[in-house]
Amino acid sequence: MNIKTLGNKIKGNPSVAGGTVFSILIIIGIGHFLNDMIQSVVPSIYPILKDKFGFSFAQIGIITFVFQISSSILQPLTGLYADRHPRPYSLSVGMCFTLVGLLLLAVASSYALILLSVAVIGIGSSVFHPEASRVAQMASGGRKSLAQSIFQVGGNGGSALGPLLAAAIVLPFGQGAISWFALAAIFAAVLLLRVGYWYSARLAYQMRNNIPAPQPNTSISRRRKYWALLILVLLIFSKYFYTACMTSYFTFFLI
């Protein structure tokens, strides 16, 4: 089905034309829940990897570094690309990256392969987050704070549950049990296809009705925007700096 045909099919559909689309927000929230649940499993299994392979704390830190670089630093690049070239089904593609990374991590037998595995999982997160945030805004119907809060609740819930599941599944049964989390990635990838279809329909509706893309706010100077962005980046950096230290090493202290 091409864009024009899809645009004809959805003509007059209120869930596409406007208004808050709670079904899409809920799906995005669930997808964020599953994505962040899987992401939080990686640091939770560090004790297993250290015991099995005899890694030093420096090597554990490098695993975290590679994971964070691929899952965080790449996000602006994927977001920039998505702004210029929207890809409605990229959310499912991101989950497929996560799926591949999980399966690799479950069978990884060397340090290099573990680094590759966590990098692939991180890339999946980098692909998911910018587009998922965009979809949440598109489905908000102007209620952007509500939409973002639903999106964030899903992610925070997943981050909280992931370590508990890792303790219940991976710690008793070993590294191979990581593959069980692949079921969550598969479910999320299939579920997010629904979002991709809605996203395609939304783009088709905008094209059919010649709805212009949102324009940047010109009432605020570019210099002020950059300063505000810099402050936000520094605040978030400081938060995740100590968060990464806690998630990487505090588990060993508890043990």
PLM region spans:
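Extracytoplasmic
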Residues: I27-P47, F55-F57, T78, M246-T251
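Residue-level signature of mid-helix packing/kink "hotspots" within the transmembrane helices
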Residues: S40, Q68-P76, S159-A160
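Extracytoplasmic gate region of multi-pass secondary transporters
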Residues: V42-P43, W227-I255
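Conserved MFS/SLC helix-loop-helix module at the cytosolic interface between two early adjacent transmembrane helices
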Residues: I73-A112
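MFS-fold secondary transporters
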Residues: G101-A106, I121, L192-L193
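Cytoplasmic helix-loop-helix junction between adjacent transmembrane helices
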Residues: S117-G154
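Helix-loop-helix hairpin linking two adjacent transmembrane segments in secondary transporters
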Residues: F151-A201
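Flexible cytoplasmic inter-helical loops of multi-pass small-molecule transporters
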Residues: F181, R194-I220
